[in-house]
């Protein structure tokens, strides 16, 4: 499954109303650690169809970033049944991100 670009317009449908566990990656194109995490998030999306993976560009979607209290990036959030069940800030390994999703 490919990564979905999350915006304020599709957030409710793609994230809050999703039956799958959702991994949200808050990032910016200029962020070095974000560029390290991005291919890991992409791989998880392809290798684990049981999860929905979305990315939120904080420069384009500052309202969503504010709603989630994102102060530093990359910020990863795990959402299950419309509730944040796990979150982390900073670059993480694939194993660490997969552990968050369990």
What are the functions of these language-model segments?
Residues 62, 68-77, 95:
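Structural micro-motif
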Residues 11, 24, 41, 57, ...:
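Residue-level signature of catalytic and energy-coupling elements of molecular machines
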Residues 26-40:
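Conserved redox-active cysteine motifs that mediate thiol-disulfide chemistry
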Residues 2, 7, 27, 54:
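Conserved Rossmann-like nucleotide-binding pocket used by diverse enzymes
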Residues 3-22, 62:
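A short beta-strand-turn-helix
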Residues 80-102:
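Non-catalytic, surface beta->alpha helical segment in thiol-disulfide oxidoreductase systems
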Residues 19, 26-30, 72:
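Short pre-active-site segment immediately N-terminal to redox-active cysteine/selenocysteine motifs
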Residues 19-21, 38-56, 62:
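Conserved helix-turn-beta segment immediately C-terminal to the redox Cys motif
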